[in-house]
Amino acid sequence: MQRCDPIRTRPIPPSRHTFIELQGYTDNCHLRAEKVCVPRRSMFVAKQSVTTDWAKVCASKVFFPCNAFRWSTTTALYQ
C-alpha cells in the first residue's frame, strides 16, 4: 500500500478571519496544500465537521480541490 505524506499548511497570522492548520491527504496520494479559513465565530464548525463547504464559510477565496480530499485532523487554531 502506498503511503501518503501528510499535507500541512503554513500558519498564517490572524486578521479578520481565523486560519486553521490542517493535515490530510488525497485518495490518489497527490500532495495538495490548501489555505482554509473560517470566521472566528465559526471555529467550532471546523472542529466538528469535515464536510464543511469552506467556500461558503469564508468570505475570501478558499481553494477546496475536490470531494475526495479527506481531513485527518485539525492540528492548530490561531486566534
From Swiss-Prot:
It comes from the Eukaryota. It is found in: Mitochondrion. The keyword Mitochondrion applies. One of its GO terms (cellular component) is mitochondrion. The keyword Mitochondrion applies. Keywords: Mitochondrion. This is Uncharacterized 9.2 kDa protein in COXIII region. It comes from Oenothera berteroana. The lineage of its organism: Eukaryota, Viridiplantae, Streptophyta, Embryophyta, Tracheophyta.
